[in-house]
Swiss-Prot record:
Entry protein name: NADH-ubiquinone oxidoreductase chain 2
Family to which this protein belongs: Belongs to the complex I subunit 2 family.
Superkingdom assignment: Eukaryota
Gene name tied to this protein: MT-ND2
Glycosyltransferase in keyword set: no
Compartment(s) where it occurs, according to its Swiss-Prot or TrEMBL record: Mitochondrion inner membrane
Length: 348
């Protein structure tokens, strides 16, 4: 791609997200979301592969549907109350419809069906952008809307997302689909605690970005897109495979890794809010996610091909990929649990 075109598209991605962050008017927030969507579509289709084009088309249709729902809901609220302010979305129909549209944008269950299919058709770099950056703008609107939204709707979205995110990943062999279901489950954890403690949602979102970025960058460096390719990765780069396995276990919430922190804090807060049944369901759903992460780690570490190679292993050669970003993300994904009191002090 022409570097000037690439610069314009990346700038548009940043502009759209920033515009949505800074907006208090629904029309400006909607414009930011659409600028963001139009910029990412060209980046998604740059491979000129049928699967990439199909994924781009599916993404466009879902995002266009969500955008139409948001515009309709905002107009309905303005007609009923005379308010375009995001924090004054008080009409019940408009509030519920907007929340469902934003849930469709970020891939919350039961509006999640597009996400595994779209992520499967993209390369790992675009999958990383779709799983992290593209969720920031809609999630900012969800955070602002949460006080005026029906609590039962948020709880239902959260529970369904964690359960479906866990069940959906059990029978998958494609790594991108597994990470898509992981994203759905993590979004469920964030959305269910949003109505009680928004600060915990922000902590969970930040740690999710660290862990997901580390996972995508590790798999990209290992050139792995299927589970069976992980079995041959150990002989090529043992250090990379070891850290990748730990990152995946961190995504699953296994202590003493970073991913345990948000789940522990959220379960603790749900218990304080007298919701033991909800906390129990969330904990059981976390076990489902942890199972398929353990399966991936098993495939990487304990199923090594019984052969030797005479070729020079890649870790002895000069790599052409920068490992600085991966190293920083790995530190965040693996070692932040001891800093829990410090992080809590910063947000509370």
């Amino acid at each position: 791609m022409n570097p000037y075109v690439l610069m314009i598209l990346i700038s548009s991605l940043g502009l759209g997200t920033t515009l949505t962050f800074a907006s208090s008017h629904w029309l400006l927030a909607w414009m930011g979301l659409e600028i963001n969507t139009l910029a990412i579509l060209r980046l998604m289709a740059q491979q000129h592969h049928p699967r990439a084009v199909e994924a781009t088309t599916k993404y466009f249709l879902t995002q266009a549907t969500a955008a139409a729902m948001i515009l309709f809901a905002a107009t309905t609220n303005a007609w009923a109350t005379g308010e375009w302010d995001i924090n004054n979305l008080t009409h019940p129909l408009a509030s519920s419809l907007t929340m469902m549209a934003l849930a469709l944008k970020v891939g919350l269950a039961p509006m999640h069906f597009w996400m595994p299919e779209v992520l499967q058709g993209l390369d790992l770099t675009m999958g990383l952008i779709l799983s992290t950056w593209q969720k920031l703008a809609p999630f900012a609107l969800i955070t602002q809307m949460a006080p005026n939204t029906n609590p039962m709707l948020l709880t239902t979205l959260g529970l369904l997302s964690t359960l479906i995110g866990g069940w959906g990943g059990l029978n998958q062999t494609q790594l991108r689909k597994i990470l898509a279901y992981s994203s759905i489950a993590h979004m469920g954890w964030m959305i269910i605690i949003l109505q009680y403690t928004p600060q915990l949602t922000l902590i969970a979102l930040g740690l999710y970005i660290f862990m997901t970025s580390a996972a995508f960058l590790s798999l990209k460096m290992a050139s792995a897109t299927k589970m069976n390719t992980l079995t041959a990765a150990w002989s090529k780069s043992p250090v990379l495979v070891s850290t990748t396995a730990l990152t995946l276990l961190s995504l699953g919430g296994l202590p003493p890794l970073t991913g345990f922190m948000p789940k522990w804090l959220i379960l603790q807060e749900l218990t304080k809010q007298d919701l033991p049944a909800t906390a129990t369901i969330m904990a059981l759903a976390a076990l489902l996610s942890l199972y398929f992460y353990l399966r991936l780690s098993y495939a990487m570490a304990l199923t090594i091909y019984p052969n030797t190679t005479n070729a020079l292993t890649p870790w002895r050669t000069n790599t052409t990929q920068s490992t600085l970003a991966l190293a920083l993300m790995m530190i965040g994904a693996l070692g932040l649990l001891p800093l829990t009191p410090t992080i809590m002090a910063l947000f509370f």
